[in-house]
């Protein structure tokens, strides 16, 4: 009996060892990892696992489903990009190619109209009628020229109530050179008119003073006044020097010296630069 028990126990032990062990349900990583090769092919960890033997059919079905989803997403993205490109091309090359330009032309027209309106308003605010009246009432003809760097203006005075009878029909010539200006009356009708004009100028020294002062206010110095062939003596106006005038003169003097020094340095620098170029050319 004891032998039978031991044999049965040994037999049962062999049977237990021969039974295959059931596989335990281990946790699985469901994350998808793609591996890209240099040849442009991509594969997932699930696809590699499916190629290995001993895998279940459920894993294969899940991998196929994921591949189909990825392909569907890629095709959808490509189709959406093509639709956007077709829409963009259609806007510029479609049935109405000038539809985009209309949006730009409308505000530009408004801006141009506004500019025209503002310019007309600024011009209308300045009253230039007095200039027209002065020219038409005193000037018969006008000549403006530039001769040898001198600005020349020649006016033929008209016969009107605003011009004295002694100067009607005479020529008034203004020649400006820098800050100096000369005035001459010529081309009188006869000698009597010339004599009358000369006496009229010489007998009114106050008007000569006001003429010189008004020209100085415009940074012009009257150097000569000639009536016919007679040079009229000009009044001398003393310059009133104030501390402000002295300061301004000092500043102008320093500015002139600085400009001269700057020009000298620039000339020296240019000379050195040219010498270097000559040396480089010789080398």
UniProtKB/Swiss-Prot annotation:
Region Disordered: start-end pairs: 1-99, 255-283
Pfam families per UniProt: DUF5421
Basic and acidic residues composition-biased segments: 14-34, 42-53, 61-71
InterPro entries: DUF5421
Superkingdom per UniProt: Bacteria
Biased composition (Polar residues): 1-10
Family: Belongs to the chlamydial CPn_0705/CT_671/TC_0042 family.
Protein name (Swiss-Prot/TrEMBL): Uncharacterized protein CT_671
């Amino acid at each position: 009996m004891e032998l039978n028990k031991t044999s049965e126990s040994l037999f049962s032990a062999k049977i237990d060892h021969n039974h295959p062990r059931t596989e335990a349900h281990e946790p699985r990583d469901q994350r998808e990892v793609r591996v890209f090769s240099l040849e442009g092919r991509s594969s997932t960890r699930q696809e590699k696992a499916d190629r290995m033997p001993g895998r279940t059919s459920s894993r294969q079905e899940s991998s196929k489903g994921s591949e189909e989803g990825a392909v569907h997403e890629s095709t959808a993205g490509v189709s959406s990009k093509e639709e956007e490109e077709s829409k963009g091309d259609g806007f510029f090359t479609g049935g109405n190619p000038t539809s985009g330009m209309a949006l730009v032309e409308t505000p530009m027209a408004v801006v141009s109209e506004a500019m025209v309106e503002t310019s007309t308003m600024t011009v209308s605010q300045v009253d230039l009628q007095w200039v027209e009246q002065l020219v038409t009432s005193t000037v018969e003809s006008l000549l403006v020229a530039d001769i040898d760097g001198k600005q020349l203006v020649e006016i033929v005075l008209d016969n009107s109530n605003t011009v004295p009878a002694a100067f009607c029909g005479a020529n008034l010539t203004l020649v400006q050179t820098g800050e100096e200006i000369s005035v001459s009356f010529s081309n009188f009708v006869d000698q009597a008119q010339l004599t009358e004009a000369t006496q009229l100028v010489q007998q009114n020294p106050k008007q000569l003073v006001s003429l010189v002062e008004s020209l100085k206010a415009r940074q012009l110095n009257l150097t000569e006044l000639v009536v016919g062939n007679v040079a009229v003596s000009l009044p001398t106006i003393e310059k009133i020097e104030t501390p402000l005038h002295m300061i301004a003169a000092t500043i102008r003097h320093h500015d002139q010296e600085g400009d001269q020094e700057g020009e000298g340095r620039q000339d020296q620098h240019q000379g050195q630069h040219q010498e270097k170029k000559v040396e480089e050319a010789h080398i």
